[in-house]
């Protein structure tokens, strides 16, 4: 017991500690479930492509689009033409009238053969037009699933005709007609009519082919324009273009484009063609799809589409196509590493370093900017 228990003490108010409760800290707890769901990839592009392929394999869709529009994919025979040349209607005034009458039966025969082959499998989607009586309404067209099925049927028919060697000449004749139309459009004088240039056209074609022997008089009619196509040299005396001394050399670099595309398509296996068909139907060029398939190998459709989508995103940033393909191949198809490599490569190229040296240094140092820059500066000194 203490002696000071009963003694009152006076304490100043400054020493008195208040007993008011302090407010707790405001903590904002994020919605972890929503964050995780938002960061997950939904694979919408892959699911859409697989759904289209499965629906096209099962049969035509009973649903139809209510909005009138154009088809989502071009005809299959246009895929064999090089994407560097635009398509336009072939001029009819350049050709000789007699030669045009001779060529028309062959084209009609080819069209009948294509129509008969298409009718054996299934009617093509182009036959169901809005104005035809088979369509349910005047303002309705088939949906993209039916268009994809028609494209696959056309691709199958094209592969069959390519194996027989019948389809290669059609894009080639179309390209020759387009080049003749471009040659006439370069002339500044509109007074010269294209009909006056057609009769003397076949005259310089015979000395342009020295390897072929002269035809005897009993050999029959001259074959149509598949063998003797109008070239720029045949129009040179009547246009503003300079005459060519020998064979039509400007056509040689461009003549191999449809042949190369046809050869690549016919050289693919059935598994590779099944991968390329839906990809081409989505709008990717045939040539780029074949090159991407050769680089990535036989993978699933989702991996193939992810590679093409990554390349397209890098191309939209302004990089060259060859450099994008090389970067994706160097970093094992990783879009993030390839994008970082392209960004650093562009920065170091603007500084004046050698491009081959930049690629080597970035590949050795794994896209580490500081170390790569130090080595480039040391090599330059």
Swiss-Prot record:
Pfam families: UBAP-1_UBA2. GO terms for biological process: ubiquitin-dependent protein catabolic process via the multivesicular body sorting pathway. GO terms for molecular function: ubiquitin binding. Disulfide bonds: none annotated. Residues 105-123 have a biased composition (Acidic residues). Residues 4-50 form the UMA domain. Residues 197-216 have a biased composition (Pro residues). This is Ubiquitin-associated protein 1-like. Residues 124-141 have a biased composition (Low complexity). Residues 95-104 have a biased composition (Basic and acidic residues). GO terms for cellular component: ESCRT I complex. The lineage of its organism: Eukaryota, Metazoa, Chordata, Craniata, Vertebrata. InterPro entries: UBAP-1-like_UBA2, UBAP1, UBAP1_C, UMA. Residues 87-141, 185-228 are annotated as: Disordered.
């Amino acid at each position: 017991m203490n002696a000071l228990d009963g003694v009152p003490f006076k304490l100043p108010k400054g020493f008195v500690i208040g007993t008011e409760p302090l407010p707790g800290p405001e903590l904002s707890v994020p919605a972890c479930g929503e964050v995780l769901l938002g960061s997950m990839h939904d694979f919408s592009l892959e699911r859409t492509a697989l759904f289209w392929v499965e629906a096209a394999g099962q049969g035509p869709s009973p649903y139809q689009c209510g909005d009138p529009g154009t088809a989502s994919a071009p005809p299959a025979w246009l895929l064999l033409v090089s994407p560097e040349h635009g398509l336009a209607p072939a001029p009819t005034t350049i050709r000789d009238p007699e030669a045009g009458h001779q060529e028309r039966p062959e084209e009609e025969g080819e069209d009948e053969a294509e129509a008969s082959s298409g009718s054996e499998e299934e009617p093509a989607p182009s036959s169901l037009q809005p104005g035809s009586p088979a369509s349910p309404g005047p303002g309705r067209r088939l949906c993209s699933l039916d268009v994809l099925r028609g494209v696959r049927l056309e691709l199958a028919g094209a592969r069959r005709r390519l194996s027989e060697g019948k389809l290669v000449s059609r894009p080639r004749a179309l390209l020759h007609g387009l080049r003749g139309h471009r040659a006439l459009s370069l002339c500044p004088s509109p007074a010269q009519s294209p009909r006056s240039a057609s009769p003397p056209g076949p005259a310089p074609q015979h000395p342009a082919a020295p390897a072929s022997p002269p035809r005897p008089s009993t050999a029959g009619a001259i074959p149509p324009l598949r063998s003797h196509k109008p070239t720029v040299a045949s129009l040179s005396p009547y246009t503003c273009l300079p005459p060519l001394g020998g064979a039509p050399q400007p056509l040689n670099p461009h003549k191999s484009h449809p042949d190369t595309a046809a050869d690549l398509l016919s050289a693919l296996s059935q598994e590779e063609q099944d991968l390329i068909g839906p990809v081409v139907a989505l709008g990717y060029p045939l040539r780029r799809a074949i090159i991407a398939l050769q680089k990535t190998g036989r993978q699933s459709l989702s991996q193939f589409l992810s590679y093409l989508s990554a390349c397209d995103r890098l191309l939209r940033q302004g990089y060259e196509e060859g450099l994008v393909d090389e970067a994706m191949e160097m970093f094992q198809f990783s879009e993030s590493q390839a994008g970082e490599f392209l960004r650093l490569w562009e920065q170091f190229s603007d500084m004046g370093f050698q491009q081959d040296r930049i690629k080597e240094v970035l590949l050795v140092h794994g896209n580490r900017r500081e170390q790569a820059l130090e080595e480039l500066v040391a090599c330059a000194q």
